[in-house]
Amino acid sequence: MGLLILGLGNPGLEFSLTRHNVGFSLLDKIVSKNGLFLKRKKKYEYSELRVISRRVILVKPLTYMNLSGSLFPSIFSDFYMCIKNLLVVLDNVDLPLGKCRLKERGGMSTHNGLKSISSVLGSSNYSRLYIGVGSNVMRDIKSFVLSRFCKDEIDRLEKLYDFLSDELIDISESNFKDKVQKINSSNF
């Protein structure tokens, strides 16, 4: 079984290091840590690695967050994957900074990126990794998720990304529950 890790974010330098782009940042860490390079297709950038005999595909959409679903179903056929191979990495304003929640399957979400994906797929039956970006102390959630991290927050997240980059690439059906326990109990 392969794994397709889809990191959510918004394209463009103006969005780098924002709370909404933690999915992109984690994938960038996995790419650099494994000496990989991103290749470009029409709607996304991707990289591929092998872990033992499993293929792991890393994908960063070139669409804005709210249009993430437009990658499907073509991305599945491009890499010979299906919904059970999908792991979406995204921000979560309800989790404290440095805390994660890995879920095997999920219900509908208020996150617009997930709404877009679930709407196109006709299902929310895929895995997700929520990365806490801190509590929303501002009234306007859009302003909050598009705000940049401060230096101390970036330092904490770098440690988290380092940890997650090792944990995610060898995730499988047989060790998923162990990974949930390890990732969900971590705090950076």
Curated annotation (Swiss-Prot):
The yes or no answer to whether the keyword RNA-binding is present is yes
Subunit structure and binding partners: Monomer.
The record's section on InterPro entries has: Pept_tRNA_hydro, Pept_tRNA_hydro_CS, Pept_tRNA_hydro_sf
One Pfam annotation reads Pept_tRNA_hydro
According to its UniProt record, which residues of this chain constitute the active site?
Answer: 20
- GO MF annotations in UniProt: peptidyl-tRNA hydrolase activity; tRNA binding
Q: Where does tRNA bind?
A: 15, 64, 66, 112
Q: Site: Discriminates between blocked and unblocked aminoacyl-tRNA. Where?
A: 10
The EC number(s) this enzyme carries: 3.1.1.29
What gene is behind this protein? pth
Q: What is this protein called?
A: Peptidyl-tRNA hydrolase
Give the species. Answer: Borreliella afzelii (strain PKo) (Borrelia afzelii)
- Gene3D superfamilies noted in UniProt: Peptidyl-tRNA hydrolase
Please name the GO terms of the biological process aspect recorded for this protein, alphabetically: protein quality control for misfolded or incompletely synthesized proteins; rescue of stalled ribosome
